[in-house]
Amino acid sequence: MKIYTCKLMIFLWVIGGLLVAGCERKEVMEYEGVDGIYFDVQYGASHGNESLWARQNYTYVSFGTLEAEEADVTMKVGISGSIKDYDRPFRVEIVQDSTNAIPEEEYTGFTEEQVIKAGENHAYVTLKVFRTARLTHDTARIQFRIEPGEHFTLPFSEVGQIPGRWNDTKTQFATGGDPAVHDVFFNNILQRPLGWGANEY
């Protein structure tokens, strides 16, 4: 029995050595080319976290469920490609023909000039939106579009399911799904909660 165990151990060592010798070390190729940039806004269930939430095509602020007269909106912009050791500016513009929100009255605090800072792979675009009288019967919309500049390109026409993230993209408002574009919708209309019948509302 002892000889059998010894032969088995030798056999396993020989097989292990052959497997290791058969391995070939390959270098991981570095990304080459212009890095991509896109809106990577995420939100979802409170029991999750940002790394798991699905990518969303729009942000919705419902003043009907808030007591506040204003709300902060944060939109994450991500990159595909390499992290750099220097700042990389880009622009975000408001698409006027797809926007009906009134500047300074219904939103403020937005800056077109943005930057992906050195050592980072994302940035946050922020603004503040306000409750106004017309929002009790109308929905305001602001459409934002990325202008990539010299450091980035817009390589995607759409972004599908991102591995490791939940697949619960919201569809209450129709959007084109272009990752270079993000819409912000806000109103003061109380929506019927999911699961409520018409006679309970």
Report each predicted region and the residues it spans.
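Intrinsically disordered, low-complexity regulatory regions in eukaryotic proteins
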Residues: 24-111, 124, 128-201
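Short proline/glycine- and polar residue-rich coil/turn motifs
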Residues: 114-122
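Bacterial N-terminal signal peptides that target proteins for export
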Residues: 1-10
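Generic alpha-helix detector with strongest preference for long hydrophobic helices that associate
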Residues: 4, 58, 108, 118-119
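C-terminal motif of bacterial Sec signal peptides marking the signal peptidase cleavage site
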Residues: 19-22
